Design a protein with these regions (language model features):
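Conserved N-terminal beta1-alpha1 strand-loop-helix module at the mouth
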Residues: 1-224
Length: 224
């Protein structure tokens, strides 16, 4: 069954609604963004979801083991921050995973203390082979649309045929233009390990609880 990450949350109430809907991860953005949160905001959201786990680094199996203990897990989204900043923020904010959404080198993953999702930007014309050649151990790849000047949350999809080709070889998180209306088809066609949404569950730039619930329900239905 595909896992669900609801990203860009800024309010404890929305995080609790995502948890009630059945989300597996909630994402808190520390990179420059209109969805950015402070450490204090993040800690309030994390504590609303329960006592944060002490989660050491690890891959898919480790993340799945953590989900047996607590759900949703709290993911901090960073872009081009150094390892010290990421680790310090993660500890202060009660994070359980980190997501690297900038142009970080893969070897940064070995310096981080938590499990990692690593954004891989997909341009028009990017092939399956190009993506696979760029992957390295140490993080779960999160495939997202490459939009100049944006770090995600753009609402723009990329070619799901390419995503499916990668997903046949590696567990991936699929992002980019997903909505309650199209995520079921995306899950059936790509068969990702997880899916990630931000703008697709917003109304006028604010998280919409009805859309969050509809998104999670669509993923569960398509994963049967």
């Amino acid at each position: 069954m595909a896992l669900v990450k609801i990203c860009g949350l800024r309010e404890p109430a929305h995080a609790l609604a995502a948890a009630e809907a059945g989300a597996d991860f909630i994402g808190l953005v520390f990179a420059e963004s209109r969805r950015r949160v402070s450490v204090d905001q993040a800690l309030a959201i994390a504590r609303a979801l329960g006592e944060p786990l002490a989660a050491a680094g690890g891959g898919v199996e480790h993340i799945e083991a953590l989900l047996q203990r607590k759900r949703p897990l709290v993911v901090g989204v960073f872009a081009d921050a150094d390892a010290e900043t990421v680790n310090r923020t993660a500890e202060a904010a009660g994070l359980e995973l980190v997501q690297l959404s900038g142009d970080e080198p893969w070897d940064l993953c070995g310096q981080l203390s938590l499990p990692i999702l690593k954004a891989v930007k997909v341009r028009d014309g990017t092939s399956v082979e190009e993506i696979i050649a760029a992957l390295r151990p140490g993080a779960v790849p999160l495939l997202d649309t490459d939009v100049e000047g944006a770090l995600g949350g753009t609402g723009r999809p990329f070619d799901w045929v390419v995503a499916a080709g990668v997903a046949r070889r590696f567990p991936i998180v699929l992002a980019g233009g997903l909505t309650p209306e199209n995520v079921g088809e995306a899950v059936r066609r790509v068969r990702p390990w997880g899916v990630d949404v931000s703008s697709g569950v917003e109304t006028n730039g604010v998280k919409d609880v009805e859309k969050i619930c509809a998104f999670v329900a669509a993923v569960r239905e398509a994963s049967r």
